[in-house]
Amino acid sequence: MAGAALSGEGRAMVQTSQEFYQLRKYTLTTGPQLALTQSYFEHALIPALNQMSIGPVGAFKLDIGPETPTYYLLIPATSVETLAMLETRLAADTQFRKAATAFWEAPAAAPPCVRVETTLLSAFAGWPKLVAPKTEKRIFQLRTYESATDAAHIRKVEMFNEAEIAIFVRTGLAPVFFGDTLIGHRMPSLTYMLTFEDVADLNKKWAVFASDPAWKELSKRPGNTDPEIVSNISNLYLSPLSFSQI
């Protein structure tokens, strides 16, 4: 069961102001798949999504993390229905199908990618809409927190909404989105993305956050400590592809 279904975020998710996200992971092999997939994103998929009034769409390359080469797509929408019907609408779009031919109709002996995995997320009440960075020079950090139980997961989401997001912003961290996993393979879990100028900027800002008195007090409260509510954290470093809209 998705954590959001049990929490305040679940009750709020019917609000049209709160976004939903598809986070797509494209696992690739080095070689022709890289250029083919990038071309598919740039010339077929992202233009088709924009024609559906979906965007901005983020397109990223995994720089630090397991399973390289890997690309990620972040697709925002104002409703679950929009994301659920995405493949059906794309399949019926003749202009998209023509532009996507090389990717969609690649032979089985030369597939365009190894595998595509999709996670469906609902935006946190405390950060209901994606915020795209305005700087040209940027990297991204994609973090996923898994919890041992639904109750622990709900408490971690509440912790973000009640105080942790505000501490992030006050100490200079720049969130792009926060999402509660509704459908995915690592549940219960949440995922969020931050943006920085470079790795040095990332390390500097995390150090400020870690030393913040309000964060130290919040994270030490009974019920808020990592051993109680977080069972695993994954941490990926991404860079935007040249045509990324985020």
Predicted regions span which residues?
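Short S/T/G/P-rich N-terminal loop/turn motif that feeds into the first structured element of a domain
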Residues: M1-R97, A102-W215, T225-I246
